[in-house]
């Protein structure tokens, strides 16, 4: 049974749904191996790559250290607030005869409508 979703509900839902959808990482395509003749050149390239990799690793370590320092400074109360915000949202709808079910990749939302403008949305992380 299809029911029109009130505009206000959509305004509340859209940003949340956008936040919940995770971005996928792009995978790099592997190049096919070169022929025997190019081996010395490949070796040289590898050496260069190794050097850059080392630099990158160092940079990453430094960044991680800085991040840890920053994290430590946050007060426990603030940390608790953040954790609660990340967990899930319960927005305050209730007539089970007019309940909607949205299905998404990561979670589903059940919306039970009592009146046209009051809604009660439950998130289930699947």
Swiss-Prot record:
Disordered, as annotated region: 21-83
The organism's place on the tree of life at top rank: Eukaryota
Biased composition (Basic residues): 21-31, 41-83
Record's miscellaneous remark: Partially overlaps NOP58.
Protein name per Swiss-Prot or TrEMBL: Putative uncharacterized protein YOR309C
Protein source organism: Saccharomyces cerevisiae (strain ATCC 204508 / S288c) (Baker's yeast)
Lineage: Eukaryota, Fungi, Dikarya, Ascomycota, Saccharomycotina
């Amino acid at each position: 049974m299809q029911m029109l979703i009130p505009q206000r509900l959509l305004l509340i839902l859209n940003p949340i749904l956008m936040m919940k959808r995770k971005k996928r990482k792009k995978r790099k395509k592997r190049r096919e191996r070169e022929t025997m003749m190019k081996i010395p050149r490949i070796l040289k390239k590898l050496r260069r790559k190794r050097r850059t990799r080392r630099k990158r690793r160092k940079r990453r370590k430094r960044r991680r250290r800085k991040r840890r320092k920053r994290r430590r400074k946050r007060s426990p109360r603030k940390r608790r607030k953040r954790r609660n915000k990340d967990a899930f949202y319960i927005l305050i709808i209730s007539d089970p005869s007019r309940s909607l079910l949205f299905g998404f990749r990561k979670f589903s939302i059940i919306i039970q409508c009592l009146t046209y403008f009051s809604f009660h949305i439950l998130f289930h992380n699947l």
